[in-house]
Amino acid sequence: MSIDIDWERATSGPDGELLAERIRSFIHDKFQQMVLPRFIRSVQVTSFNFGTIPPELEIRDLTDPFPDFYEDGDEDLSVSSEEQSPMREQADRYRERIDSWQANSPGGLEVQMSGRMGFGHPLQLAPDEDGSRLHPLRSPINLGDINPYLFPRSGTPGIPGGTSNLGYFMPLSGLSGSQTPLRAVTRGNPFSGGWPDSPLENESRIGHGQGPPRRRSEVNVDAIQSRPSTANTGNTLFSRGSVSTGDPRHSHSSQTVLANNPGQAPEANDSPVSAVPPLSGTPPRRMREQKAEDFQVFCRTKYAGNISLSLTAEILLDYPMPSFVGLPLKLNITGLTFDAVAVLAYIRRRIHFCFLSPEDAYALIGPETGGGGGDTMEPNSLRRKNLSLLRKIRVESEIGRKENGKQALKNVGKVEKFVLEQVRRIFEEEFVYPSFWTFLV
């Protein structure tokens, strides 16, 4: 069954001009993303015209829509975003609270969180944060053999080696095993909590007469046996929920809440990111419900009209030196001819449109009768010929200025070949299934 189209009404007027401008802008953006050859500096798409000759349409079959057409799209993404808005607002409020604590609290976030988490003692801060000095060394470690030039300290009668202001969590950088209480570290007594895994981490921060400042995640040694650690509490207590909107065809939301176990102290070197591994994998596709009024039409489409596409390319001349001068080249693509099977699906105020490749068209609706009336196109012949949906494309080129009614240069073969190949590629990648276009009606 053939269909007549009022081509002039469909392509003229404000709506037709707007559609033509959108197609021109789309093709122009595709050319800007391409890697141009060395002899072409730039390509600009200047105009697109539908012409006056309509295509010939013939309905071949009426079936149910493809499953890909039922996949969630932009409309479902907006609905899911609205459903997630209360959760996102709550996450923003919590985040604003934490930011206000960090900005207004003189002692930092750890002091605030220690009281709000129900612990009896505030966190012990570094000396450079609250102005207090570290506690003197109260361990029975013999530091008499340490080089006094490394750690100068005043001599005190009755105390071997004198006093020191080195704290419990001191990294004795560069010391040998005989001078470092490795046995105490390996046995897991209270001295082991503050020894770093690598003594080279804070080697550059050891100064004369004062040990390195402790990290903010370290707690008071007096309470190390009586209450759990709240290391990195401010960073890992809450993580904002994120809604992924990278792909408009897939939408998912993830709300991640990270909290330390109150009965178990985290590792000293664990970062907030590594506390909970990131979610991996793509969520399953969300499909719409199929309804009885959904339908799909296979339509044989033949076109041999005067649709036109105008481009301007700047080519580079390498004489007498590389990229010596650039010449504007005007290309007018017209005389487009194609013969393909179009798919038109209607699903709840949406129209999905695409073309089928020759092999897919043969598998779905059978062989097509050629123009002679008797020959058929078999899939093996399609593979051998590697037929494109665009059977013919005519291009008219103009380069340089016109002198006495004649062009200075014309028919630049390399540029024409490149532009035609890219036009074919754009058409086949953007309009041939599984790629398709969706229109809201």
From Swiss-Prot:
Keyword DNA damage recorded: no
Transmembrane stretches, start-end: none
Alphabetical UniProt keywords: Endoplasmic reticulum, Lipid transport, Lipid-binding, Membrane, Mitochondrion, Mitochondrion outer membrane, Transport
Organism: Paracoccidioides brasiliensis (strain Pb18)
Protein topology in the membrane: Peripheral membrane protein
Main location: mitochondrion
Biased composition (Polar residues): 226-245, 253-263
GO molecular function: lipid binding
Highest taxon of the lineage: Eukaryota
Subunit architecture: Component of the ER-mitochondria encounter structure (ERMES) or MDM complex, composed of MMM1, MDM10, MDM12 and MDM34. A MMM1 homodimer associates with one molecule of MDM12 on each side in a pairwise head-to-tail manner, and the SMP-LTD domains of MMM1 and MDM12 generate a continuous hydrophobic tunnel for phospholipid trafficking.
One GO term (biological process): mitochondrion-endoplasmic reticulum membrane tethering
Name of the featured protein: Mitochondrial distribution and morphology protein 12
Main function: Component of the ERMES/MDM complex, which serves as a molecular tether to connect the endoplasmic reticulum (ER) and mitochondria. Components of this complex are involved in the control of mitochondrial shape and protein biogenesis, and function in nonvesicular lipid trafficking between the ER and mitochondria. MDM12 is required for the interaction of the ER-resident membrane protein MMM1 and the outer mitochondrial membrane-resident beta-barrel protein MDM10.
Location of this chain's protein in the cell: Mitochondrion outer membrane; Endoplasmic reticulum membrane
Family per record: Belongs to the MDM12 family.
Domain topic, free-text comment: The SMP-LTD domain is a barrel-like domain that can bind various types of glycerophospholipids in its interior and mediate their transfer between two adjacent bilayers.
PANTHER family, per database record: MITOCHONDRIAL DISTRIBUTION AND MORPHOLOGY PROTEIN 12
CC terms in the record's Gene Ontology section: endoplasmic reticulum membrane; ERMES complex
Residues in SMP-LTD domain copies: 1-441
InterPro entries attached to this UniProt entry: Mdm12 (IPR027532), SMP_LBD (IPR031468)
Region (Disordered): 180-289
Name of the gene: MDM12
